[in-house]
Amino acid sequence: MAYITKRGNSFGVRYTYEDEHGKSCDKWESFPTKEEAVKRQKQIEHELATGTFLIPSTVTVAEFLMDWLPKQCSKHKWAPKTYESNLSTIQNLIIPYIGDMEMQKLRPYHMENLYTTLSKTPCGSYIEGKKQELGEKQKRRTLSGTTIHEVHRLLGTAFQYAVEWGIIIKSPVPVDSPKKSTQERTIWTVDEMRAALDSMEDPVLHLAVHLTLVGALREGEIVGLTPDDIDFDAADGIGTFHINKSMQRVRKEALNQVDDGCIIKIFPDKLERSTTSLILKSTKTASSCRTIFMTSALKEELKKWLGQMAADETKDPERYRDSGMLFRLPNGLAIEPVLIRKKFLKWQDAHPEFPRIVFHGLRHSSATYQLMISGGDVKVVQGTTGHATADMLVNTYAHIQQSSRVELGKKFEEGFYVKPGTPSPQAVPAEGEPTISVSALVELLKNADPEVKAQLRLALLT
């Protein structure tokens, strides 16, 4: 029951409820008029009778999220990087702005204000929850729409749990999410890929890039390879390498929170008091486990690389530290993803004639090229790239390159301007040009024997 008591010039509503621990609690709420007090009295009695009463709580957004995060990690068996990414979002993009607000006082307009603030916030304003001093150039680079969309997604999920846990009645997260950034990534053409590979003299970088272009690998998958993943005799001597592991450097805090079932190996720390660990883990999804067919050039390079590894071990066996990885330093220690990225950046600085791309752009370029040479066979290319769904592959990686658009324009001109009853003009090939068009060749290959398709693909990638 709820009772109304006049207290001076106001009216108080007194009621008793049980908290989340079953303890009986008394609560007073004050109102300026009796009408408001009566309205609140009826609301409380109805909610207590129907079990919809919201227990008063002063839990803040920061307190709730830091309680929710490890529970979600344990429930869904997150990988270390997933936990680390979500923790970073909470610490750097949410808590500094709405962390001190009480959950029960949060409203949709607070969320809209958060998104507006983030859209004007420079990248890196907070690191591990600590305010950073940024230079003028850094201040001009603000958070992307994709990043703000991720904040919206995380809060949407978290606040639904707050509703289930009885902390709030309704989620304050707006239905409409902030728009993602749609800027297309820069990729290389096949000529640029080939020329870039030819210009790379660093054997570590050359092999890493070669593997990426053939198999559309992720950075962690490249350095996550081990010698026993390679089979030179598989597929009737074509040779294959198997992708089932990934290497990452993660914060030790994340390792303490996640299920270690996905972790294959934790490498020894190189520095004392390191706050991060280098780990080898199973790939993030079942579809990421895949077998890649070698090209003859890649096969020879891998054989040469393994031969050099054996030679390095015999030079100084006492100091050699066999990490068990395919990519390793001359002393046997594992090469981690950041070193590959640094080598690639150094190469790019020395070769400004190539379009500037991030290392992951090589995977992007490879997937796009393979879609082109396969005649758009998404399922076949998906088997190589390891995307969880075909839609993800098409939406993320399928670029229409300039050469394809030019060809499309020519076909439009040939067909659109022909008058009824007039035979279509046939292009006469110049001397030395093939007498079959690319489109006709693609149609023939679609119905070709699978073995012929595989041989042609290997020839094009060699």
Regions found by a protein language model. Give the residues of each.
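N-terminal DNA-binding module of tyrosine recombinases/phage integrases
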Residues: 7-113, 128, 307-322, 402, ...
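Short, polar N-cap/turn motifs at the start of nucleic acid-interacting alpha helices
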Residues: 229-237, 375-398, 424
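C-terminal secondary-structure termini that scaffold catalytic or DNA-interacting sites
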Residues: 232-235, 245-289, 298, 410-462
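Basic, Lys/Arg- and aromatic-enriched nucleic-acid-binding interface segment
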Residues: 127-145, 149-151, 164-227, 235-238, ...
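Short, basic (Lys/Arg/His-rich) helix/loop patches that form interaction surfaces
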Residues: 124-127, 198, 202-203, 215, ...
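Catalytic-site neighborhood detector that most strongly recognizes the C-terminal catalytic loop/helix
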Residues: 179-180, 187, 245-249, 385-411, ...
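Short, Arg/Lys-rich segments that mark the N-terminal edge of DNA/RNA- and chromatin-recognition modules
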Residues: 1-32, 240, 244-274
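N-terminal core-binding DNA-recognition domain of tyrosine site-specific recombinases/integrases
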Residues: 3, 17, 70-164, 182, ...
